Amino acid sequence: LFHTTIRRNLLYGKPDATDEELDAAARAANIYDRIAELPDGYDTVVGERGYKLSGGEKQRVAIARVILKDPRILILDEATSSLDTTSERLVQAALVPLMEGRTTIAIAHRLSTILSADVIFVADRGRIVERGTHAELLRRGGIYARLYEQQFRGGLVEAVTEDGVIMATGEVVRTGSG
């Protein structure tokens, strides 16, 4: 985030956005209630890189800005890497509808970010070593399956991995309500 108000940070996504559009984007990004709690609301000045906001709040303001921008291609680089579990859930809930209908490239160590990707690429030491859907990669029993086991079944959701970076690309398609 830039050293300016939350409003101006959001308007970088769409300079001519109306107050109603700002509200809709903030609600979609799960940050509206927090902004409303601030003494100056959208006119609250945030410091360089958003020092007055938590990591999750900064991410959600950035997501609201992207919602306003409405890009055809979305690139997420470690979107939930430094967040606690609660903030991660809020950010992921905001990302799901944002990713629908557009190409999304997500770079992540936390596999929860990419489970529903159409295609997952696993990189190790600078090379793509696996490619497939979540189910396919689990069946193969390679690096991805080991990371999944470590992060989910082993209860180490915040595990730091040394095997490589996981990248996912594709559109997220909602298959039910929720």
Pin down the residues of each PLM region:
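ABC-family ATPase nucleotide-binding domain "signature/switch" substructure
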Residues: 4-11, 20, 25-31, 41-140
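Conserved hydrophobic/aromatic "anchor" residues
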Residues: 1-2, 42, 144, 148
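Short beta-strands and strand-coil junctions in structured, solvent-facing domains, enriched
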Residues: 1, 33-34
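Long, low-complexity, intrinsically disordered segments
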Residues: 170-178
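C-terminal boundary and immediately downstream tail of ABC-type ATPase nucleotide-binding domains
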Residues: 139-171
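A generic structural-conservation signal
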Residues: 35, 77, 146-147
